[in-house]
A protein has these predicted regions:
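Short beta-strand segments
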Residues: 21-23
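Nucleotide-activated sugar donor-binding and catalytic core shared by glycosyltransferases
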Residues: 1-17, 28-145
Length: 145
């Protein structure tokens, strides 16, 4: 729990008053509540449906997550993403995309957030074959056999 406290406090401090919109599962929300972490810019809410979550992502300056799927969405949309893991289910998100892995290290999170807040985040690009043409390629393969 102490590490969660340090991560949350780092996010709040480094956000410098910018709103932190944090959809969290119940057990994480409860853990944060039990730690007594509050800030005027911290908005904790339950997980959101796909469309509203997509809206939130599109409006974000950056994303902090532990989800590989969220890192994928961020890479596809060109949104800076900080992943609180030492691995990624989709390595292309950090190899060529907008994702950076910082683990659960508050110091690494602080450095990444400093880079993000200064506007110096890596640009990233779409990984190969993330062009939205998958169905077209599948049809091509099926009709050529």
């Amino acid at each position: 729990k102490e590490n969660l406290r340090q991560l949350m406090e780092t996010m709040i401090e480094k956000a410098d008053g910018m709103p932190i919109v944090a959809p969290m599962h119940t057990y994480v929300r409860n853990a944060v509540k039990d730690l007594g972490i509050e800030a005027p810019n911290l908005h904790i809410m339950p997980p959101q449906n796909y469309l509203f979550f997509g809206y939130l992502i599109n409006k974000a300056k950056g994303i902090i997550t532990d989800s590989g799927n969220v890192a994928e969405e961020a890479t596809f949309l060109g949104i800076p993403c900080i992943t609180l893991n030492t691995y990624a289910e989709h390595p292309e998100t950090w190899r060529v995309g907008t994702n950076e892995l910082v683990g659960e290290d508050p110091s690494a999170l602080a450095r990444a957030m400093d880079t993000l807040m200064k506007g110096e985040w890596k640009k990233g690009e779409l990984p190969e074959r993330w062009d939205g043409r998958t169905a077209e390629r599948i049809v091509q393969i099926l009709t050529n056999k």
